[in-house]
Regions:
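Conserved SAM-binding loop of SAM-dependent methyltransferases across substrates and taxa
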Residues: 1-9
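Conserved acidic E/D residue at the C-terminus of a beta-strand in Rossmann-like folds
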Residues: 15-21, 98-99
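Conserved Rossmann-like nucleotide-cofactor binding loop
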Residues: 22, 223, 284
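Conserved SAM-binding loop
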Residues: 27
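Conserved SAM-binding strand-loop segment of SAM-dependent methyltransferases
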Residues: 32-39
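Class I S-adenosyl-L-methionine
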Residues: 43-53, 60-225, 231-241, 247-249
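FAD-binding beta-loop-beta segment adjacent to the flavin cofactor pocket
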Residues: 207, 244-269
């Protein structure tokens, strides 16, 4: 609904199929007019014949190179075929399907079903997040969004500094806090990006010189996991594992909302764990809004 509003598309009726009770709670809080119908697998889509637009995306874990690599045999991936079933029953004028980059074989199968070639859009054009996704749609004249030049410094809290223009991914996963063993294993691979300003008594007027950065990919990981922090890359300091633990923090739910170009506090009211999950499973709103603007042309 946020994307439709930003695209200037008037909505008379919005029906959602969602089984995650926390995602439903967020939807009801922000848009009480949404009709929630629960499990898509039991839906009789003929009820909605004549609706103008169907938009959706099956869980990315089933298609992605990451995760368990279960592809089309994964029950989560089979939700794609529910999308196909919905289109056949409803026969909307327009559709939009989102999914992750995947093997060419799987991409080609989806393309064959959808009847249109996908467009690859990186969220970093409209946000501070690196998030490449494929979009299959018959909405006309979809081009790449203009780069808004949004940097990580634009979304992080005032207690942090960043150091790159466009970053590698950081995963905002469901679950646990950072621990010593995690840093021992991965600290050399994580790109150093944020330092809390209250470390060593604050920076005062002599803040370290930093190079400002695009961020992170927010994504969820099945079965829990860690939320890697953004870490300083100050050449004047060589951090030990314990020192890294002292000067790092998680990306906050508010920052994740901004990375997904949602309104501040959109997921407020849930636990942080559930906020991370909802945000990781969601879309970058301004990418969707960019595509939906084609409905008005």
């Amino acid at each position: 609904m946020v994307a439709l509003e930003r695209a200037g598309v008037k909505v008379d009726r919005y029906v959602a199929f969602e089984i995650d009770k926390y995602a439903i709670e967020v939807g009801k809080k922000n848009y009480p007019q949404i009709e929630h119908r629960g499990n898509v697998e039991t839906a009789d889509f003929t009820e909605f014949k004549g609706f103008d637009l169907i938009i959706g995306g099956s869980p990315c874990q089933g298609f992605s190179h990451a995760g368990k690599k279960l592809n089309f045999e994964d029950p989560r991936s089979k939700l794609f075929f529910e999308f196909v079933r919905a289109i056949k029953a409803v026969q909307p004028e327009y559709f939009l399907l989102e999914n992750v980059k995947m093997k060419a074989d799987y991409e080609n199968i989806i393309t064959e079903y959808m009847g249109v070639e996908p467009i690859l859009i990186n969220s970093n054009l409209v946000s501070a997040q690196d998030r490449k996704r494929l979009y299959w749609t018959n909405i006309p004249n979809i081009k790449q969004p203009e780069d808004k030049g949004i940097l990580l410094e634009d979304v992080v809290g005032e207690d942090a500094l960043v150091d790159r223009d466009k970053a590698q991914a950081i995963i905002a996963s469901i679950g646990r806090t950072i621990h010593r063993e995690y840093f021992k294993k991965y600290q050399g691979q994580l790109y150093k990006a944020i330092m809390l300003s209250n470390i060593y008594g604050g920076f005062g007027e002599k803040k370290p010189r930093v190079h400002l950065n695009k961020s992170v990919t927010i994504r969820t990981a099945s079965g829990g996991g860690h939320i890697p922090s953004l870490i300083i890359n100050d050449k004047a300091i060589n951090f030990t594992v314990d020192e890294i633990k002292e000067c790092t923090r998680k990306v906050t739910p508010l920052e994740c909302e901004r990375l997904q170009t949602l309104p501040d506090d959109y997921t407020e009211g849930l636990s942080n764990t559930q906020r991370y999950k909802c945000l990781g499973n969601g879309w970058t709103v301004d990418v969707i809004a960019h595509i939906l603007k084609g409905l008005k042309e």
